[in-house]
């Protein structure tokens, strides 16, 4: 439990209405001199933002997330199947929770999942992954001389920009945060 005056941006709290992330917090003094804490809260399972007022000194339950390592197995009926490497249970994760992370997934990739009450709320990919190039544009002679770039389609279906010397079948290292080519492996 934390006191309302200890709320800070980025903190997760649990209320009777659900799980929320604090996105803004301020102390407000009312007309009669009574102060309260005004917080903007984003629902953890959607993009809905609500405003809540808390009395000064009110106790609020802070949500304690658990980080788990999950190994991606395959996709099944619009859900992604993972294996929890801690207890070897299978976990299904929806496309909504995956967001754009699924663009880089291939079997065997280990991700970090933020879990609360045995429910996965977010997935974080490794910052760097090694993926195979399955298709590239043909670089013209002028592109090779000037050191330009070309498009490459990776084995997971994502398209990125690569240097002209990258060919089909090459394994390349990419930054999953920026979707940029790092190096040929």
Swiss-Prot record:
GO MF annotation list: translation elongation factor activity
GO term, biological process aspect, one: peptide biosynthetic process
PROSITE patterns: EFP
Keywords for the protein's UniProt record, in alphabetical order: Cytoplasm, Elongation factor, Protein biosynthesis
Keyword Protein biosynthesis: yes
Pathway(s) served: Protein biosynthesis; polypeptide chain elongation
Localization annotation: Cytoplasm
Bilayer-crossing regions: none
Family: Belongs to the elongation factor P family.
Functional note: Involved in peptide bond synthesis. Stimulates efficient translation and peptide-bond synthesis on native or reconstituted 70S ribosomes in vitro. Probably functions indirectly by altering the affinity of the ribosome for aminoacyl-tRNA, thus increasing their reactivity as acceptors for peptidyl transferase.
Protein name: Elongation factor P 1
